[in-house]
From Swiss-Prot:
Active site, per annotation: E328 (proton acceptor), H329 (proton acceptor)
Species of origin: Thermosynechococcus vestitus (strain NIES-2133 / IAM M-273 / BP-1)
Cellular-component GO terms for this entry: cytosol
Co-factor binding details: Binds 1 zinc ion per subunit.
Protein name in the entry: Histidinol dehydrogenase
Residues involved in substrate binding: S238, Q260, H263, H329, D362, E416, H421
Residues the entry annotates as binding Zn(2+): Q260, H263, D362, H421
UniProt GO molecular function: histidinol dehydrogenase activity; NAD binding; zinc ion binding
Reactions this protein catalyses: L-histidinol + 2 NAD(+) + H2O = L-histidine + 2 NADH + 3 H(+)
UniProt xrefs under InterPro entries: Ald_DH/histidinol_DH, Histidinol_DH_CS, Histidinol_DH_monofunct, Hstdl_DH
Family: Belongs to the histidinol dehydrogenase family.
Residues that, per the record, bind NAD(+): Y130, Q192, N215
SUPFAM superfamilies: ALDH-like
Superkingdom of the organism of origin: Bacteria
Length: 431
């Protein structure tokens, strides 16, 4: 049952509890398991991958069958409908168009005495994309991770994903990968896949950046290999916070709440509204839509533990509460959403108006759906082209510029006791 909370102190406490739902305290057992997997893959390479795949996925592989071959890639196109292929291609087009606008440009500026300063952006050489298996196939995850890497100019893009029954990979995932330009695909998942990407094996060369969502073990593995490789984020369960006025449609709000809850038993679905009548209507609509929901058990668990409706005095108070929660997805289902946007400080993505369900951002609109969760929107942003880029500073001094500023450099170097730093300038200033 979706709860309605009317007391502000209780509402704040519940929002904090939900935000902290993935703070599992001691995870020593899981961390130890992941550490052992990482060490084993780093040491034994393909043999470890094959043994872990047999242990966890109950699939028997060989070094020759780790990589998805061309005939399986070709066959995938015969197994998807024209409607799905068209949808994948439209999504690719719009995601690519959006991310091309976000590519930063290298620059230089010319200062006094011939000083040249600048910044040069370059892509990483290789990126590894993790695509979950398990409850569902996620071609959208492929597109959202691969396309920014392509736009950034990454030369080698690798995808890893757990194998299904018969060693197969979902054809929709394979088609999305090919549409996004990926041909190097491996049927391996879990922490062992992250280890392979980070350390390399006989079959899977290492990469520079790893992106993509996964379960707790994948997240812990990404956390532990960070530093050896870059990562996008430590993503937790999905979440939506909806701010709605009395004119919002209850059934539509209910569908948006359930759209998050159906992801995961830990998913959060929150509505903040000043309208008690809307709140009650949403509860009714949620119950009606759950009645024949194909993922009813999973979705009900999320709604029961991490779903709520909070009654607020004003929409402005709702925004203040949202900022403290820093949701992954924020929907402003109000008559004038632009009047609230400037007050929003912390949100992964903001969806404006009654006709903008979060699902359009998940699949098609263009902005990335890989977003910060569990309050991380306070300091983090969506995955994007920048995830696959790095920048180098450019500095050039002329003799005149060094004569003018060298004294200050030497003073600072002497203050820090770094005599060779001082002398590297002094020797250049000698006649």
């Amino acid at each position: 049952m979706l709860r309605i909370i009317t007391q502000l102190t209780d509402l704040r406490a519940e929002l904090r509890r939900i935000c902290d739902r993935t703070d599992s305290g001691e995870m020593s057992e899981q961390q130890a398991t992941v550490e052992a997997i990482l060490r084993r893959v780093a040491k034994d390479g393909d043999r470890a991958l094959i043994e872990y795949t047999a242990q966890f996925d109950h699939i028997d592989l060989t070094p020759e069958t780790l990589r998805v071959k061309g005939d399986e890639l070709d066959a995938a196109y015969q197994q998807v409908s024209k409607e799905l292929l068209d949808a994948i291609r439209l999504a690719k087009q719009q995601i690519e168009a959006f991310h091309r606008q976000r590519v930063p440009k290298s620059w230089v500026q010319f200062g006094e005495d011939g000083v040249v300063l600048g910044k040069r952006y370059t892509a990483v050489d290789a990126a590894g994309l993790y695509v979950p298996g398990g409850r569902a196939a996620y071609p959208s995850t492929v597109l959202m991770n691969a396309i920014p890497a392509q736009v950034a100019g990454v030369q080698r893009i690798v995808m890893v994903t757990p194998p299904g029954q018969g060693k197969g990979i979902n054809p929709a995932v394979l088609v999305a990968a090919q549409e996004a330009g990926i041909q190097e695909i491996y049927r391996v998942g879990g922490a062992q896949a992250i280890a392979a990407l980070a350390y390399g094996t006989e079959t899977i060369p290492r990469v520079d950046v790893i992106t993509g969502p996964g379960n707790l073990y994948v997240m812990l593995a990404k956390k532990q290999v960070y530093g050896r490789v870059g990562i996008d984020s430590l993503a937790g369960p999905s979440e939506v916070l909806i701010i709605a006025d009395e004119a919002a449609h209850p059934a539509q709000i209910a569908a948006d709440l359930l759209a998050q809850a159906e992801h995961d038993p830990l998913a959060a679905a929150i509505l903040l509204t000043p309208s008690l009548s809307l709140a009650k209507a949403v509860v009714t609509a949620v119950n009606e839509q759950l009645a024949d929901h194909p993922r009813r058990v999973l979705t009900e668990k999320a709604i029961a533990h991490y779903g709520l409706i909070g009654i607020v005095e004003t929409l402005e108070q709702a925004v203040e509460l949202s900022n403290s929660f820093a949701p992954e997805h924020l929907e402003l289902e109000v008559e004038d959403p632009w009047s609230l946007v400037e007050q929003v400080r912390h949100a992964g993505a903001i969806f404006l108006g009654y006709s903008t369900p979060e699902a359009v951002g998940d699949y098609l609109a263009g902005p990335n759906h890989t977003l910060p969760t569990s309050g991380a929107a306070r300091y983090a942003s969506a995955l994007g082209v920048e995830t696959f880029l790095k920048h180098s500073s450019i500095i050039q001094y002329t003799p005149a510029a060094l004569r003018k500023q060298g004294g200050a450099v030497m003073t600072l170097a002497e203050t820090e006791g770094l005599i060779s730093h001082r002398d590297s300038v002094r020797l250049r200033l000698q006649p």
